[in-house]
Amino acid sequence: MDRIRIVGGNELNGIIPISGAKNAALPLMIASLLTSDTLTLENVPHLADVELLMRILGNHGVDVAVNGRRERQEDSYSRTIHFTCRTIVDTTASYELVSKMRASFWVIGPLLAREGHCRVSLPGGCAIGTRPVDLFIEGLTALGATMEIDAGYINAKAPAGGLIGARYTFPKVSVGATHVMMMAATLARGTTVIGNAAREPEVVDLANCLNAMGAKITGAGTATITIEGVTSLSGARHRVLPDRIETGTYAMAVAMAGGDVVLENTDVALLETAVETLRRAGAEISSTNNGMRIKRNGAGIRPVDIVTDPFPGFPTDLQAQFMALMTRSSGVSHVTETIFENRFMHVQELARLGARISLSGQTAKIEGVQRLRGAPVMATDLRASVSLVIAGLAAEGETTVSRVYHLDRGFERLEEKLTRCGAIVERISE
């Protein structure tokens, strides 16, 4: 099992290219099930979750060609992948594959819309709280589907003639459930109105792609999305938007280690709340023609309190990274997690590096320390793993992060990108 070794103390200076967003790429890939034509996606990141989803889609009948060929391209950050699903050959999504990644559960929407029935395993993925599927079930039921849970699977069936447009308001905001209901509604009869919809850029990206395929979606990016159903969708070509979580992660790494880095192929507008929070913490951030520049030279890190919220609030997927940054602040800060009820698993590992963090319910109190000291630590989930890398960049001595398969699910060549900017980061294969 691979490990990441970090020797702390070096500033970061240089250019880091930002990859396509994993959280956008996955639903876009799943949307290929909605059409018999070819969906071409550009700027697809090379990540473990993407590779796994390609296997899952292949089981359903999707032919996948990477960069126009069927061999894998290992030497590029940005890949173009063609997805063609002439016929859906299997409407069952097995536990063996779905349990490995929660987002693969989202195939339930397109399979139900196109074939009228499917059998999908209950999901797995990150061990962050319960993350129930109730919202998915309620949303699809509103479109006329019958849903039955049996032996760990959901058996879903559309009414005769297909799904039927409806008005439905989610009781709480859910990005995944918004993705699924929006995809399913594109082929439903009539008009669907989704209330309390997720407003994340990744939802907008999916809507833009679906519209390019012939869907009629308006309101994406607001709390109310309207979908006029169509009889079929065609192929399209779409570029995956930049990864705002990767952007924020590297921005926090620079704020932690110090230095001057340009993040290319990204957009400050994708994470304005996080950028403003970093400015309050002492980082200098400015827009460039193709991204953003972040500097922290000499100035200390100021304590800042945050509360995670759905977009446009502070992203829960940057909470662990920001907590790592606050361990070196000049005072006391508080991090309150409102999205998931069990997303502080990185706290005990940061404590191994010398962080002073105490928990009270969904709030963490961080007392900044003058120095962190390297130690062996263990990744517990995707975002927690990268928070340990960020802490290691500023820790004295050597930090070794184990179980980095979590890291490979969401960060493309992290050690290579950091090393190019002067960090001492290496992967150790065992």
From Swiss-Prot:
SUPFAM superfamilies: EPT/RTPC-like. It catalyses: phosphoenolpyruvate + UDP-N-acetyl-alpha-D-glucosamine = UDP-N-acetyl-3-O-(1-carboxyvinyl)-alpha-D-glucosamine + phosphate. Keywords: Cell cycle, Cell division, Cell shape, Cell wall biogenesis/degradation, Cytoplasm, Peptidoglycan synthesis, Pyruvate, Transferase. Phosphoenolpyruvate binds at K22, N23. Pathway: Cell wall biogenesis; peptidoglycan biosynthesis. InterPro entries: Enolpyruvate_Tfrase_dom, Enolpyruvate_Tfrase_sf, MurA_subfamily, RNA3'P_cycl/enolpyr_Trfase_a/b, UDP_GlcNAc_COvinyl_MurA. One of its GO terms (cellular component) is cytoplasm. The keyword Transport does not apply. UDP-N-acetyl-alpha-D-glucosamine binds at R102, R131, P132, V133, D134, L135, K172, V173, S174, V175, D317, I339. GO terms for biological process: cell division; cell wall organization; peptidoglycan biosynthetic process; regulation of cell shape; UDP-N-acetylgalactosamine biosynthetic process. It is found in: Cytoplasm. The modification 2-(S-cysteinyl)pyruvic acid O-phosphothioketal is found at C126. Its EC number is 2.5.1.7. It is an enzyme of class 2 (transferase). It comes from the Bacteria. Gene3D superfamilies: Enolpyruvate transferase domain. HAMAP family: MurA. PANTHER family: UDP-N-ACETYLGLUCOSAMINE 1-CARBOXYVINYLTRANSFERASE (PTHR43783:SF1). Belongs to the EPSP synthase family. MurA subfamily. Cell wall formation. Adds enolpyruvyl to UDP-N-acetylglucosamine. This is UDP-N-acetylglucosamine 1-carboxyvinyltransferase. It comes from Rhizobium johnstonii (strain DSM 114642 / LMG 32736 / 3841) (Rhizobium leguminosarum bv. viciae).
